């Protein structure tokens, strides 16, 4: 298996846009025609299932923000899982926008869980290298995983 960086570069150099599509589902922004009357998580799942073919034609990767899914509880997490699976089924790389930053066995558990669904994840380094090590272990060799460490964010302050 090639590295995450090599997989992303291959797609971009092969002619796909270098843009990673952020998936931050907001119910008020979804078309009313998407699964009308369904629960929020079902609407989100339906929207991204229907949008994924178009995304896959133009972008090499998606970046679902887990917070927008988690707010709907277990059903929201299931929607996150379904969205990641659909993206991968379509040949897209998945960057889990999870912003994890714990240490020790907690970080190891996060790494195991998130790399089950995503090819790469976002991390924040506040707690130091110990918070990144379990994730970096998944990036060594031919494991095909990657991390994006938050250094400067789009936060206005």
Which positions does each model-derived feature cover?
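P-loop/Walker A phosphate-binding loop and immediately adjacent motor/lid segment at beta-alpha junctions
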Residues: 4-14, 90-92, 137-153
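Conserved N-terminal beta1-alpha1 strand-loop-helix module at the mouth
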Residues: 1-64, 69-82, 86-91
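Basic side chains
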Residues: 11, 63, 99-100, 152
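Conserved anion-binding
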Residues: 26-27, 35, 102-157
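Structural preference for beta-strand elements that scaffold enzyme active sites
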Residues: 18-22, 60-63, 93-95, 120-122, ...
């Amino acid at each position: 298996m090639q590295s995450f960086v090599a997989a992303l570069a291959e797609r971009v150099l092969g002619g796909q846009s270098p843009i990673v599509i952020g998936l931050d589902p907001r119910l008020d922004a979804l078309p009313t025609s998407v699964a009308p009357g369904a629960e929020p998580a079902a609407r989100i799942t339906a929207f991204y299932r229907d949008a994924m073919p178009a995304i896959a034609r133009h972008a090499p990767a998606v970046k679902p923000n887990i917070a927008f899914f988690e707010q709907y509880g277990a059903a929201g997490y299931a929607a996150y899982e379904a969205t990641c699976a659909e993206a991968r089924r379509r040949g897209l790389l998945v960057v889990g926008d999870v912003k994890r930053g714990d240490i020790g066995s907690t970080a190891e558990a996060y790494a195991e869980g998130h790399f089950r669904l995503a090819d790469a994840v976002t991390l924040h380094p506040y707690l130091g290298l110990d918070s990144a090590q379990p994730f970096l272990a998944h990036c060594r060799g031919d494991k095909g995983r990657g991390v994006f460490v938050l250094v400067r964010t789009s936060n206005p302050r």
